[in-house]
């Protein structure tokens, strides 16, 4: 079971809700994926008018755990304010904290992230910290009270998959008891499987499903890939070797 701030979930797939062709496809993709947690941007929800209200009603009808996020924030003040608004609107202390440092790469501003995390942790928030694959940053986030760290796999929406596996592997090795969720940059089900094979606890993705030719089928594919990756990790994956090793025993081999 996946344990997040004292709550247990059977699915290790978390799904974003943006960019889907229609609400109906989003709903069906969520159902097919088996996810129990979806992320929602407060900026989308509070975009105003009738559309925002309809989306909020749609979310309530899903009867699923909502993880609001601070997507689109560039400063500590923006992120903290957004977190407070999200807590009031969604009635949850959970917040996926993300602060962008560069408009082109969408790379997290880890310095502002740590500062905002310290503030929000002191105010009783349960933070899911979206960060880079830097071990030291992850440790600093733990120091200020975060219990769930979300290293990126690659830049948001890039679909490149794990581009720095050694970084992800290092975080997992040095933080064996911390809940780690790979977030951003996932493009294929195989990417998600790799993350799970590294020992990560879950995967959060959005674009790879939302922009797929068949989002519903892709949601199912990711669900199965994550399950397979987790099973492989638990079973004990064979380490790669630089030399060949025969798999067929030579005892009893005929000699001519």
Curated annotation (Swiss-Prot):
Entry's EC annotation: 2.8.1.10
Q: Which residues bind 1-deoxy-D-xylulose 5-phosphate?
A: 157, 184-185, 206-207
Q: Which reaction does it catalyse?
A: [ThiS sulfur-carrier protein]-C-terminal-Gly-aminoethanethioate + 2-iminoacetate + 1-deoxy-D-xylulose 5-phosphate = [ThiS sulfur-carrier protein]-C-terminal Gly-Gly + 2-[(2R,5Z)-2-carboxy-4-methylthiazol-5(2H)-ylidene]ethyl phosphate + 2 H2O + H(+)
Q: Does the keyword Transferase apply?
A: yes
Look up the record and give one Gene Ontology term from the biological process aspect: thiamine diphosphate biosynthetic process
Per the record, what is one GO cellular component? cytoplasm
Keyword Hydrolase annotated: no
InterPro entries in the record, alphabetically?
Aldolase_TIM (IPR013785), Thiazole_synthase_ThiG (IPR033983), ThiG (IPR008867)
Q: In terms of domain of life, where is this protein from?
A: Bacteria
Q: Active site annotated at which positions?
A: 96
- Taking the first listed entry, what is the main subcellular location of this protein, grouped into a coarse class? cytoplasm
Q: Which UniProt keywords apply?
A: Cytoplasm, Schiff base, Thiamine biosynthesis, Transferase
Identify the pathway: Cofactor biosynthesis; thiamine diphosphate biosynthesis
Q: Which GO terms describe its molecular function?
A: thiazole synthase activity
One Pfam family from the UniProt entry? ThiG
PANTHER family xref list: THIAZOLE SYNTHASE
Q: Which family does it belong to?
A: Belongs to the ThiG family.
Q: What does this protein do?
A: Catalyzes the rearrangement of 1-deoxy-D-xylulose 5-phosphate (DXP) to produce the thiazole phosphate moiety of thiamine. Sulfur is provided by the thiocarboxylate moiety of the carrier protein ThiS. In vitro, sulfur can be provided by H(2)S.
The protein's name = Thiazole synthase
């Amino acid at each position: 079971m996946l344990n997040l701030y004292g709550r247990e979930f059977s699915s290790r797939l978390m799904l974003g809700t943006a960019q889907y062709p229609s609400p109906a496809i989003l709903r069906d993709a969520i159902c097919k994926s088996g996810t129990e947690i979806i992320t929602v941007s407060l900026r989308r929800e509070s975009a105003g008018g009738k559309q925002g209200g309809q989306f909020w009603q749609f979310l309530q009808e899903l009867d699923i755990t909502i993880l609001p996020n601070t997507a689109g924030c560039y400063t500590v003040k923006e992120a903290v304010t957004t977190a407070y608004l999200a807590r009031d609107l969604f009635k949850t202390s959970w917040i996926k904290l993300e602060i962008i440092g560069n408009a082109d790469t969408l790379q997290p501003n880890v310095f502002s992230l740590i500062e905002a995390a310290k503030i929000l942790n002191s105010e009783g928030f349960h933070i899911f910290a979206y960060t880079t694959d830097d071990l030291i940053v992850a440790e600093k986030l733990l120091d200020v009270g975060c219990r769930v760290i979300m290293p990126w796999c690659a830049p948001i929406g890039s679909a490149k998959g794990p581009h720095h596996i050694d970084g992800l592997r290092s975080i997992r090795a040095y933080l064996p008891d911390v809940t780690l969720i790979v977030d951003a940059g996932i493009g294929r089900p195989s990417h998600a499987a790799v993350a799970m094979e590294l020992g990560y606890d879950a995967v959060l993705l959005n674009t790879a499903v939302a922009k797929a030719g068949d989002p519903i089928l892709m949601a199912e594919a990711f669900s199965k890939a994550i399950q397979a990756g987790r099973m492989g990790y638990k079973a004990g994956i064979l380490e790669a070797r630089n030399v060949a090793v025969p798999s067929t025993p030579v005892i009893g081999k005929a000699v001519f």
